Amino acid sequence: MMMIMGRKCEDCGNQAKKDCVYMRCRTCCKSKAFHCQTHIKSTWVPAYRRSHHKHQSQPLSTSIPKGVQIHTTPGHFPAELSSLADFRCVKVSSIDDGKEQYAYQTTVNIGGHVFRGILHDQGLHKVMVDHHYNKNSNNHQELLTPSTSSCPLKITSPFTDFMFGTRFSSVLRR
């Protein structure tokens, strides 16, 4: 039994489309800029454009851990989420007494909306709140004692609690 093979592309040897008058595959026909009616009608999109289009149509999720998808509708946000954020150490002062304190400023993007805020020092807290961690997990965190001699520039943390509307006096640079 003899098998009838399709036409081969004259340039690369791949299978040519049977109606192509130039006897080329799609890629070679397009790359040589032939005005082939068979390939013009085709809905084929080059691989580099497909992946580029796919990345453009998907929402960015840099602040959401891999495997977690948060779908937000306009005006509706998740009651709670966990994300990574960079915190900058800043000096803040109260309008009432003018006393300077250290705080951390951050900005996060949730569902395309930008949230910016400052975390104020609430004093020492030795008990971790089970609100953010599963009681059965083996997550251990060391509590750091505050030090007035050093203030790190960046800290990565999964917490995103804010006090809005607070002004800060200057950003510490070290």
Swiss-Prot record:
Q: Name one GO biological process term.
A: auxin-activated signaling pathway
What InterPro entries has UniProt attached to this entry? Answer: SHI (IPR007818), SHI_C (IPR006511), Znf_LRP1 (IPR006510)
Q: Which GO terms describe its cellular component?
A: nucleus
Residue spans binding DNA: 9-36
Explain the consequences of disrupting this gene.
No visible phenotype.
UniProt motif (Required for homo- and heterodimerization) ranges: 110-113
Q: Keywords, A to Z? A: Activator, Auxin biosynthesis, Auxin signaling pathway, Developmental protein, DNA-binding, Metal-binding, Nucleus, Zinc
Ribosomal protein in keyword set: no
Subcellular location field: Nucleus
Which residues hold Zn(2+) 1? C9, C12, C20, C25
A Pfam family: DUF702
Asked if the Swiss-Prot or TrEMBL record annotates the protein with the keyword Nucleus, the reply is yes
Q: What does this protein do?
A: Transcription activator that binds DNA on 5'-ACTCTAC-3' and promotes auxin homeostasis-regulating gene expression (e.g. YUC genes), as well as genes affecting stamen development, cell expansion and timing of flowering. Synergistically with other SHI-related proteins, regulates gynoecium, stamen and leaf development in a dose-dependent manner, controlling apical-basal patterning. Promotes style and stigma formation, and influences vascular development during gynoecium development. May also have a role in the formation and/or maintenance of the shoot apical meristem (SAM).
Q: Which family does it belong to?
A: Belongs to the SHI protein family.
- Which PANTHER family does this UniProt record tie to the protein? PROTEIN LATERAL ROOT PRIMORDIUM 1 (PTHR31604), PROTEIN SHI RELATED SEQUENCE 3 (PTHR31604:SF16)
By what name is this protein known?
A: Protein SHI RELATED SEQUENCE 3
